[in-house]
Amino acid sequence: IVRDDETLEPFRPHILSVVDVFSGMGVATLVSKSNSLSLTRLLWKAIDKFGKPDMIKGDNGKDYLSKDFQSLLDGLNITYDAAIAYAGEQKALVERRFGTLQHAGISKMHGHIGNNLAKREMIEQKTPKKDRRAKDEYGFAKKTNQKLLHTFSEACELLEAEVIKWNMSKVRRKKGVKTPLELWNS
């Protein structure tokens, strides 16, 4: 959970990510709302970093299958292969990246609500019941301790730092296996 930069209202942002299959290099962005415009921005960011792909394997959500996004892909001559619903193994690299990001530095951010419902409920239970029904200093309902929440722009910078760290890091990789950045540069 982060706070809006202007209104300071807490909200839950979305993480959008692209991962290069060969190297494992990734690009990710934090958006307030996942829609075709935010996907288009992410695609241009990925093209700027990796070049134009021949094919993208992705989600089957309405924003991914929208007319705007699909016409952009058609115009760029990029084939889109939508994964079957609820089949995360079909886009395993991206799902693994989300898991890594959720368990890494993002889990240390103020306002992190866990990576599953049980953890979220456990975190919310740490806040006294009377406080969960109360309002924060900005007048918004608080379910968790939201006093130290990052702003949206701060959270974007933290996410970008985690992506860079992942791309350059050998942490928890098998001995002799190159980092994504080393694979990309080879």
Task: List the predicted regions and their residue ranges.
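A short, conserved beta-strand element enriched in hydrophobic/aromatic residues
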Residues: 1-48, 52-60, 82-85
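Globin-like tetrapyrrole-binding proteins
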Residues: 60, 70-185
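Extracytoplasmic/secreted cell-surface and envelope-processing proteins
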Residues: 64-67
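Distinct, well-ordered alpha-helical segments
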Residues: 43, 69-70
